[in-house]
């Protein structure tokens, strides 16, 4: 399944009426699905990806979070939060501090879903000392204010900031029509070719951070890239794993 198919699959998903999603559903313990650890991921990399000139995040620090992991029912709406978990677990693992923090879905969602916390992080990031918040933040953008509880890349950046990690928000070609985040918070608009070039440079680093791509409906994580004379290959961690599907199917490559 490629990115377009995934977006198409979920574009028709809607709720019958708007509401504030402030609760999450706990699954029964016997239905729990555990995130894939680094050993499993290294095995998948070896079996699935035989590219030459393959560059990726360090699999020793990768974990794969996907729908309904940790006994939380987030099927059809939680891919953005799972993407955040993938990034955070990677960055904290590099610092050997993953066990010092609770980055479970439930904790992240309940802590970073509400406006006050996110506004305070925005003020910190922009060195705002008073309450002169830009007007563009008056629109609903927080997960508790939206229909589906989805976390835009803007939310991801603020969460990373709270863990003392930096991030950059880029638009590829245009502002996504389904985004809750204000257009003003993005740093730069680039085309796809520029995006590929940036990824090539980015993944030259042995411990390069995975990259979230998020259109306001579906969130995926790019963990590697291979560029040859004719094609570009992205290694994808896709949290949008169907309920009865093997979670390993959420790790694949797309050829462009």
Regions found by a protein language model. Name each.
Residues 5, 19, 36, 40, ...:
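Acidic, Ser/Thr-rich intrinsically disordered and amphipathic helical segments
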Residues 10, 147-154, 159-170, 244-256:
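Non-catalytic membrane-recruitment/adaptor modules and adjacent regulatory linkers
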Residues 81-88, 102, 153, 157, ...:
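Generic preference for well-ordered alpha-helical elements
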Residues 79, 92-93, 172-173, 224-227, ...:
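Short coil/turn segments at secondary-structure boundaries
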Residues 3-11, 15-24, 32, 231-256:
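Noncatalytic regulatory segments and standalone regulatory/sensor domains
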Residues 46-146, 157-165:
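Active-site nucleophile-adjacent alpha helix/oxyanion-hole segment immediately C-terminal to the catalytic cysteine
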Residues 161, 166-238:
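Active-site-adjacent substructure of cysteine-protease-like catalytic cores
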Residues 7-75:
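Flexible propeptides and autoinhibitory/regulatory segments associated with cysteine proteases
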């Amino acid at each position: 399944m490629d990115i377009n198919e995934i977006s198409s699959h979920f574009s028709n998903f809607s709720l019958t009426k708007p509401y504030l999603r402030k609760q999450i559903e706990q699954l029964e313990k016997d239905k729990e699905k555990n995130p894939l650890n680094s050993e499993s991921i290294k095995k998948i990399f070896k079996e699935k990806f035989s590219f030459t000139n393959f560059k990726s995040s360090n699999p020793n620090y990768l974990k794969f979070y996907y729908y309904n992991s940790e006994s939380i029912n987030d099927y059809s709406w939680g891919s953005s939060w799972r993407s955040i978990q993938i990034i955070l677990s990677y960055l904290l693992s590099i610092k050997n501090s993953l066990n010092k923090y609770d980055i479970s879905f439930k904790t992240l969602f309940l802590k970073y879903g509400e406006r006050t916390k996110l506004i305070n992080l925005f003020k910190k990031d922009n060195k705002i000392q008073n309450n002169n918040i830009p007007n563009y933040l008056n629109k609903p953008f927080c997960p508790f204010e939206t229909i589906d509880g989805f976390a835009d890349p803007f939310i991801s950046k603020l969460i990373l900031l709270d863990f003392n990690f930096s991030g950059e928000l880029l638009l590829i070609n245009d502002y996504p029509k389904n985004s809750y985040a204000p257009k003003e918070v993005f740093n730069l608009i680039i085309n796809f070719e520029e995006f590929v070039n940036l990824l090539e440079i980015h993944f030259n680093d042995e411990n390069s951070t995975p990259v979230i791509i998020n259109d306001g409906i579906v969130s995926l994580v790019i963990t590697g890239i291979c560029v040859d004379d004719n094609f570009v290959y992205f290694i994808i961690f896709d949290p949008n794993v169907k309920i009865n599907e093997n979670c390993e199917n959420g790790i694949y490559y797309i050829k462009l």
